[in-house]
Regions:
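A short secondary-structure junction motif
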Residues: 17-30, 177
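Extended two-metal-dependent nuclease catalytic cores across DNA- and RNA-processing enzymes
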Residues: 3-5, 29-186
């Protein structure tokens, strides 16, 4: 079916990011230090800001500003991105390479975050548990969709290392409102 867009926004990550201060186990995005930036990145960013009205996120990543905006708009928003991290946000999503639209339910978003807490995120140098990929993470979490139960299963998998669970969760969690930092669920 045809779809119409009333408005849209584009977000780019700025230079500062609170996650660099949270990461103590290994440097956040430390695996990218020696990798050169694409040759025309600065020109492209400038063009997107000037010609397309892209906004630059300062102090947080573009993923956070997208998540905040999507949370405010609810089902009146479609997140268009290839970034799997955004699948922890409830709502409509669209993968423009696969031409695939899908809806993430609240319980799916929650499980996505806790799965990442187990697997880590190699792209951002967030170390998960050794030899735990999506399949093993799914076995650890089972059919659980209750956040406290998910947290307890992750904590058990980390052999009670609450500090490491907290660090990974705070690195992986995308903000739903400005300044938000993930905290463990309360009993």
């Amino acid at each position: 079916p045809d779809c119409f867009v009333d408005s849209w926004s584009m977000h780019l990550t700025g230079k500062n990011n609170f996650r660099y201060e949270i990461a103590t186990t290994v440097p956040y995005k430390g695996n990218r230090v020696d990798k050169p930036k694409p040759k025309h990145l600065a020109f492209l960013r400038d063009y997107l800001v000037k010609e397309w009205g892209a906004s630059i996120s300062e102090g947080q990543e573009a993923d956070d500003t997208i998540a905040i905006e999507a949370t405010k708009l609810g089902d009146n928003c479609v997140i268009v991105s290839l970034d799997k991290d955004l699948d922890q946000i409830v709502g409509w999503h669209y993968n423009f390479v696969k031409h695939l639209g899908y809806y993430i339910k609240p319980e799916e978003a929650l499980v996505k975050l806790y799965t990442q807490m187990l697997t880590g995120d190699a792209a951002d140098n967030i170390k998960g548990l050794f030899r735990v990929g999506p399949v093993k993470a799914a076995k650890i979490l089972g059919d659980t969709t209750d956040e406290l139960e998910l947290y307890n299963k992750v904590l058990e998998a980390y052999e009670g290392n609450a500090e490491r669970v907290l660090e990974n969760a705070q690195l992986l969690f995308l903000r739903r409102y400005e300044g938000q930092i993930w905290t463990p669920p309360q009993t």
